Amino acid sequence: MKLRIFSIMASLILLLTACTSIRTSSEGKQKAHETKTKEHIVIAAVGDSLTEGVGDPDGKGYVGKVADSIRSDKQVKTVDVKNYAVKGNRSDDLLEKLKDKKVQKGIKDADYVFFTIGGNDLMKILRQNFLQLTVEPFQEAEKPYEKRFEKIISEIRELNDHAELIYVSMYNPFTFTLSELNEINGVVTDWNHIAEKELKKDKHAKIVHIEDLFNQKSDSSRISEEDDFHPNGTGYSLIAKRVYQAIKKEGLPKE
């Protein structure tokens, strides 16, 4: 009788051990699946010349350089880049661009959406008021720009509600050519605040500040000698480093 009880108890112990082992193994596999980095990542990029990569000798710009950094992750097999940025585009041009079916398809498929905008909006105001330049025209343009910026985010989110949306801030491109226009620094700061305020409303959106990379005379080595306006290869590498750091902080997208 005692032998039979001992045999039953031993069987129960073995059964419980097996069940626990199966459950632990299953939970481990499930956890591994939940935290697995995506093997195939898609980046869509829209906006102006800064996102297009104008001034970079190798043509990659910050978008291509960030893609290269993501490719260096051992868990990532491919990074597909769809860059729809156009030199000279203002915020109203970008809103029109977002109506393009090809652009919409690219954004829908994206894990990341990178964009820059606003620099050409400022440039338009500067050209129109160059002979009598004051801060007033820029201040008057802030509200309309804020509405367009908000609309840009809204349009992107209608196409894709889960992608990480990364806006690269504006910098003062006249630091190296028209340094006497000190007021532009304040205008750029104000317009970046507008963008940051709107982006904070979206939990999957962020601004990457780069204005400090191009705000000193000594930073001129980061600007293209061809136009004294856009970043060169070094400048774009520094921008890409900032963007990639922001991405790594949040972690690459999961399966």
From Swiss-Prot:
Signal peptide: none annotated. This is Uncharacterized protein YpmR. It comes from Bacillus subtilis (strain 168). InterPro entries: Ester_Hydrolysis_Enzymes (IPR051532), GDSL (IPR001087), SGNH_hydro_sf (IPR036514). PANTHER family: SPORE GERMINATION LIPASE LIPC (PTHR30383:SF27), THIOESTERASE 1/PROTEASE 1/LYSOPHOSPHOLIPASE L1 (PTHR30383). One of its GO terms (molecular function) is lysophospholipase activity. The gene is ypmR.
